[in-house]
From Swiss-Prot:
Source organism: Staphylococcus epidermidis (strain ATCC 35984 / DSM 28319 / BCRC 17069 / CCUG 31568 / BM 3577 / RP62A)
Protein name: Large ribosomal subunit protein uL4
Protein function: One of the primary rRNA binding proteins, this protein initially binds near the 5'-end of the 23S rRNA. It is important during the early stages of 50S assembly. It makes multiple contacts with different domains of the 23S rRNA in the assembled 50S subunit and ribosome. Forms part of the polypeptide exit tunnel.
Assembly and binders: Part of the 50S ribosomal subunit.
Region (Disordered): 55-75
Protein family according to the UniProt entry: Belongs to the universal ribosomal protein uL4 family.
């Protein structure tokens, strides 16, 4: 267990929180992390590609010429693959690219991504945002005060409409919940801001 500083949104120290090293301070497993990122990127693919095979191309119902006696090669339809305008052989069809990973591997990947951010000093814990109403300007001031880079992942314990609406119009800022935290979002962001309650919730699930 290690202690981490908890900051207020004005940048001052609010206190500290003790978090499990098994979640936030492991040696990142790069191969599992790579596999988890590939899994998520594959799941994002639409897979709607399609071409027409010989049965789907319009026309070609009549035999082009008789079977024997012409001296030419026998043909059954002008929509066969060797004809111009014919169907495609073994072309792409709609499919899902999603596949599964064991739960232990998925959790190891998340722990690795979190530990990587902590090791990079790209992990900031705040006590709470405390927005009473959506204020984009105030949220930008918070990011400036906490010296955050352009690509930031903000993690709250539960859905916080005021935080989501405040950050929605700021390029490079993404808001998610502790339950929705995933490897692709973590690795895509340059920095992570997480509330103390969200950090405890993540620890509870992954420990």
């Amino acid at each position: 267990m290690a202690n981490y500083d908890v900051l207020k949104v004005d940048g001052s120290k609010s206190g500290s929180v003790e978090l499990n090293d098994a979640v936030f301070a492991i040696e990142p497993n790069n191969s599992v992390l790579f596999e988890a990122i590939n899994l998520q990127r594959a799941s994002l693919r639409q897979g709607t590609h399609a071409v027409k095979n010989r049965s789907a191309v319009r026309g070609g119902g009549r035999k082009p010429w008789r079977q024997k006696g012409t001296g030419r090669a026998r043909q059954g339809t002008i929509r066969a693959p060797q004809w111009r305008g014919g169907g495609v052989v073994f072309g792409p069809t709609p499919r899902s690219y999603a596949y599964k990973m064991p739960k232990k591997m998925r959790r190891l990947a998340l722990r690795s991504a979190l530990s990587f951010k902590v090791q990079e000093n790209s992990f900031t814990i705040v006590d709470t945002f405390g927005f009473e109403a959506p204020k984009t300007k105030e949220f930008k001031n918070v990011l400036t005060t906490l010296e955050q880079p352009k690509k930031v992942l903000v993690v709250t314990e539960n859905e916080d409409v005021n935080v989501e609406l405040s950050a929605r119009n700021i390029p490079g800022v993404q808001v998610t919940t502790a339950q929705g935290l995933n490897v692709l979002d973590l690795t895509s962001a340059d920095s992570v801001i997480i509330t103390e309650a969200a950090a405890k919730k993540v620890e509870e699930v992954l420990a």
